[in-house]
């Protein structure tokens, strides 16, 4: 991948000038000028996902310049480098090949001259065989009872992805009860212990190195809890499996290495749900549905790799997002799924985007000072968010572009719930784009029998400026296939932006310093003596903690 500061390109400079030409133009103006705006500014994937980006403050010229920017930043070259197994994660000297995990075509993917697909398929086959034994009840616990509960112990990518997907695909789940433990706060796992029976519980310990502090602390507590009932350490093998590559530590823990499911250093944590880390997904919805999830992602991979940029959905979303953050002044993006099963989707891509593109050093090793990299990502399901933070989106002083996501078909057709939900989905993007003028507010008061003199002090508060950018992403239905495609779409959006931002999207050095300092502080917490080795604030906090505990 090349080192190209995007602000040095002709396209960026042209975009700066172009921004000025739209300064007094609103989204409403653009709809008045372009009668076919919806058709011209929307794309469809596989007749399953419709992406409408028409309610952004963009024109054809904007899109053409953004596409030029992508070209001048060598996006196509970077894309091929990723798919072909080049080590584009240069700070860790690793390939980036989560796409190989869902490569349903089985065409060879080479890393250091070796095809990785045989190993990928071998792990998939092993996961299938294991999951079928557990789901069918053939796998027995130490007292001969079938497994009823599965507890996934992991953190970050080893938790967020599997948890999000198992929740999103809850309509497809089987009889097994799924639990996810991530926080090192003992409360998290203690609450799971209250709901489970050691005789019928299977723990999945998800840690590539089998040394992750939070995960191994929870895993050891789970082992202690289990052995308090089971007594004999040989029973651990019937109730624990490992998603790891450290066979020595796995064996030392008491897990049979036959029940160890490996993955590779070219799989980043936040892109790992497609790997052995997805075992909890398989145990929840079955292997066929997991395969459909992989297939949906693979189809989006093909679309992203092979489709010209003009019709390329992930690239288009990336470019529009970049326009909003770097040329319209936004610092944040909200992801708002109008589907309760998708309640962890925003949290998942909060990690996906912010850990990938939350960087301030460019690929050239220089500090980035004249453009924005990754935005702040957040969100909640609709309609809950409407009664919480939409006030600020509509009438606040901060510009917040939003992605609205909804399925046309619901898995739970109760009375008119879904029509009411979707009426809000459609209404919100309309309200954000077009707002409500002072004249409309006054007309509404007059119609209600009020005089303008009576209401003149209230009118300004009921005006909506509009001109707030949104994307609408409408799925036919949330299925394993369409969810896989949707996740891959957002993954590739993040990749495109990282290429243009000239950063390394697949490392995460920003998480290291806090961990290092925590390791230094931990032994200081065990005694009663005063701590003096930090700044006055940290010393004061630690010493107050010691006094109060």
UniProtKB/Swiss-Prot annotation:
Q: Name one Pfam family in it.
A: PGI
Instruction: Tell me the enzyme class.
Output: isomerase
Identify the catalytic residues: 355, 387, 515
**Which Enzyme Commission numbers does its entry carry?**
5.3.1.9
The places in or outside the cell where this protein is found are:
Cytoplasm
Part of which pathway? Carbohydrate biosynthesis; gluconeogenesis; Carbohydrate degradation; glycolysis; D-glyceraldehyde 3-phosphate and glycerone phosphate from D-glucose: step 2/4
Sorted alphabetically, the Gene Ontology BP terms of this entry are:
gluconeogenesis; glucose 6-phosphate metabolic process; glycolytic process
- Does Transcription regulation appear among the keywords? no
Among the GO molecular function terms of this UniProt record, one is: monosaccharide binding
- What PROSITE patterns does this protein's entry cite? P_GLUCOSE_ISOMERASE_1, P_GLUCOSE_ISOMERASE_2, P_GLUCOSE_ISOMERASE_3
Family membership noted in the UniProt record: Belongs to the GPI family.
Please give the name of this protein: Glucose-6-phosphate isomerase
Q: Which organism does this sequence originate in?
A: Mannheimia succiniciproducens (strain KCTC 0769BP / MBEL55E)
What does the record give as the organism's lineage? Bacteria, Pseudomonadati, Pseudomonadota, Gammaproteobacteria, Pasteurellales
